[in-house]
Amino acid sequence: MDVTIQHPWFKRTLGPFYPSRLFDQFFGEGLFEYDLLPFLSSTISPYYRQSLFRTVLDSGISEVRSDRDKFVIFLDVKHFSPEDLTVKVQEDFVEIHGKHNERQDDHGYISREFHRRYRLPSNVDQSALSCSLSADGMLTFSGPKVQSGLDAGHSERAIPVSREEKPSSAPSS
């Protein structure tokens, strides 16, 4: 007779609230301080996982702001140089792609690649879009909004990434 053995409900992972670390965005980075706190994992459960909210704040998640006057995207790309990044506007979308070939770091050899796609609001002036990379690795994509009723100018074009020598003024989460 086959019997399925399951962990008690209080020791099971909470599915979408605690996804597998396999899909976390920090493949080439070391452990965080809270990953090294053994008393948490042993006192709560052998299956304890750090809060997803905490790991989201520490990862390279982007921030999108859209107010009355402008549209801005902040994206942490600290492992990429401007030459590794491609920013394109196509119709109502901005596509940001980053890729660098295999290189050596503190933990061995690593290559990274990402692709992000964001919908632009219909009233963003696509002829005035800009993109810059700060000294601390924060990519800032921005564009002013036009008055309603004016043509925002939809076309496909590449946006050059300029390098800034100062750190980003984007808020850290």
Swiss-Prot record:
<keyword id="KW-0597">Phosphoprotein</keyword>
<feature type="compositionally biased region" description="Basic and acidic residues">
    <location>
        <begin position="153"/>
        <end position="167"/>
    </location>
</feature>
<feature type="modified residue" description="Deamidated glutamine; partial">
    <location>
        <position position="90"/>
    </location>
</feature>
<dbReference type="Pfam" id="PF00525">
    <property type="entry name" value="Crystallin"/>
</dbReference>
<dbReference type="GO" id="GO:0009408">
    <property type="term" value="P:response to heat"/>
</dbReference>
<feature type="modified residue" description="Deamidated asparagine; partial">
    <location>
        <position position="123"/>
    </location>
</feature>
<keyword id="KW-0273">Eye lens protein</keyword>
<feature type="modified residue" description="Deamidated glutamine; partial">
    <location>
        <position position="50"/>
    </location>
</feature>
<feature type="modified residue" description="Phosphoserine">
    <location>
        <position position="45"/>
    </location>
</feature>
<dbReference type="GO" id="GO:0005737">
    <property type="term" value="C:cytoplasm"/>
</dbReference>
<dbReference type="InterPro" id="IPR055269">
    <property type="entry name" value="Alpha-crystallin/HSP_16"/>
</dbReference>
<feature type="modified residue" description="Phosphoserine">
    <location>
        <position position="122"/>
    </location>
</feature>
<dbReference type="GO" id="GO:0046872">
    <property type="term" value="F:metal ion binding"/>
</dbReference>
<feature type="binding site">
    <location>
        <position position="107"/>
    </location>
    <ligand>
        <name>Zn(2+) 2</name>
    </ligand>
</feature>
<feature type="binding site">
    <location>
        <position position="154"/>
    </location>
    <ligand>
        <name>Zn(2+) 3</name>
    </ligand>
</feature>
<keyword id="KW-0963">Cytoplasm</keyword>
<feature type="modified residue" description="Deamidated glutamine; partial">
    <location>
        <position position="147"/>
    </location>
</feature>
<dbReference type="GO" id="GO:0002088">
    <property type="term" value="P:lens development in camera-type eye"/>
</dbReference>
<keyword id="KW-0862">Zinc</keyword>
<feature type="region of interest" description="Required for complex formation with BFSP1 and BFSP2">
    <location>
        <begin position="1"/>
        <end position="63"/>
    </location>
</feature>
<keyword id="KW-0479">Metal-binding</keyword>
<feature type="binding site">
    <location>
        <position position="100"/>
    </location>
    <ligand>
        <name>Zn(2+) 1</name>
    </ligand>
</feature>
<feature type="modified residue" description="N6-acetyllysine">
    <location>
        <position position="70"/>
    </location>
</feature>
<comment type="function">
    <text>Contributes to the transparency and refractive index of the lens. Acts as a chaperone, preventing aggregation of various proteins under a wide range of stress conditions. Required for the correct formation of lens intermediate filaments as part of a complex composed of BFSP1, BFSP2 and CRYAA.</text>
</comment>
<feature type="modified residue" description="Deamidated glutamine; partial">
    <location>
        <position position="6"/>
    </location>
</feature>
<dbReference type="GO" id="GO:0005212">
    <property type="term" value="F:structural constituent of eye lens"/>
</dbReference>
<protein>
    <recommendedName>
        <fullName>Alpha-crystallin A chain</fullName>
    </recommendedName>
</protein>
<feature type="binding site">
    <location>
        <position position="102"/>
    </location>
    <ligand>
        <name>Zn(2+) 1</name>
    </ligand>
</feature>
<feature type="region of interest" description="Disordered">
    <location>
        <begin position="145"/>
        <end position="173"/>
    </location>
</feature>
<keyword id="KW-0143">Chaperone</keyword>
<dbReference type="InterPro" id="IPR001436">
    <property type="entry name" value="Alpha-crystallin/sHSP_animal"/>
</dbReference>
<feature type="glycosylation site" description="O-linked (GlcNAc) serine">
    <location>
        <position position="162"/>
    </location>
</feature>
<dbReference type="InterPro" id="IPR008978">
    <property type="entry name" value="HSP20-like_chaperone"/>
</dbReference>
<comment type="subunit">
    <text>Heteromer composed of three CRYAA and one CRYAB subunits. Inter-subunit bridging via zinc ions enhances stability, which is crucial as there is no protein turn over in the lens. Can also form homodimers and homotetramers (dimers of dimers) which serve as the building blocks of homooligomers. Within homooligomers, the zinc-binding motif is created from residues of 3 different molecules. His-100 and Glu-102 from one molecule are ligands of the zinc ion, and His-107 and His-154 residues from additional molecules complete the site with tetrahedral coordination geometry.</text>
</comment>
<dbReference type="GO" id="GO:0005634">
    <property type="term" value="C:nucleus"/>
</dbReference>
<keyword id="KW-0539">Nucleus</keyword>
<feature type="domain" description="sHSP">
    <location>
        <begin position="52"/>
        <end position="162"/>
    </location>
</feature>
<keyword id="KW-0007">Acetylation</keyword>
<keyword id="KW-0325">Glycoprotein</keyword>
<dbReference type="InterPro" id="IPR003090">
    <property type="entry name" value="Alpha-crystallin_N"/>
</dbReference>
<comment type="similarity">
    <text>Belongs to the small heat shock protein (HSP20) family.</text>
</comment>
<dbReference type="GO" id="GO:0051082">
    <property type="term" value="F:unfolded protein binding"/>
</dbReference>
